[in-house]
Amino acid sequence: MADIRPLERTLRENVTWNRARINFLAKFLVALVQVKTINLVQVSSVMSGLAKPDSHYKRIQRFLRFFHLPFAELARFVIALIGLKPPFVITIDRTDWYLGETPLNVLLLGIASQGISFPLLWTILEKKGCSDTAERITLIEDYLRLFGRQSIEFICADREFIGVDWLAFLCREGIAFRLRLKENLLVENSRRRKRVAARNLFRTHRAGVGVLLAGPRQVLGQSLFVMGMRRSDGEYVIIVSSEESEQMLTDYARRWGIETLFGCLKTRGFCLEATHVTDKERLRKLLALMVLAFCWAYRTGQWLTQADPLKIKKHGRLAKSIFRHGFDHLRRILCNQDCLLERIAFIRLCKLLSCT
């Protein structure tokens, strides 16, 4: 069983929670990494201490129910811990699943960096399906209150995040963006006299080659720049931007970092879909705990690769992701605390959760 005191010391230096909350956080993070699932029954079954699993489970429930978690402090902690520097590429997307017939729907904002997105802010949508404009604007406004407009390089998001009011908000706030259009959305043609389906503007161009249309075009009431590409499978990737740039398609590709993040939180990491928590605020807090564990694993991976870089395969990708590399190492150390060398290694890993 891990001695959590080194982890408690590190957490006290970096968060403003009281001693009891820090003790709980340390126990929860260690247990979460050990069991590789956010299922609270399994987490409580391995939490350190003399209490029975039922007592640990009730303690988790009390934390989720009563603790007013400082989400703004957590967002700043993530940025400082990973060492992210503005201006940021902001990604926004949604992930959903079902618990029986109950839809669980998370709208999340993160910072794209190093091929992944680091989660900062999120909200739980009490419905199934897409987010609406008001929900997106609220999330962006929460971000702006914390970090300001000047901290944003641009926002990138998929086809769900298109709409008249949404584009008007981004343009009004002076926030740059790279957003993907649905290929049947109407866009001005080259003569500016007629609106046609966006795909028709790229139908005759060679597959796999990005084309930036000349001049801004009217898109949902805004004058925007449009770049697109016809893929070899016949699908179109069409991006609109508030700025003219030959890099629009490349910029938009950074959106995939948030898909990688969702994979880490779900099947490749902490099995988010295994939770039975459905209450909006409790699920939001549970995600916060998972984000801390995710960042710890990622920092561990960064630290490991400084001394021993990951191999690159023939296709140009890493043999293992930095997150997975760190997560596997962290779990091995935490699951073998009977060994003196592993206890010493755990003390070193605890220091990786420090921003100083």
Where are these regions (language model features)?
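Single, function-defining residue in the core of a domain
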Residues: 1-37, 46-49, 67, 74-75, ...
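Helix-turn-helix DNA-binding elements, focusing on the entry/boundary residues of the two helices
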Residues: 40
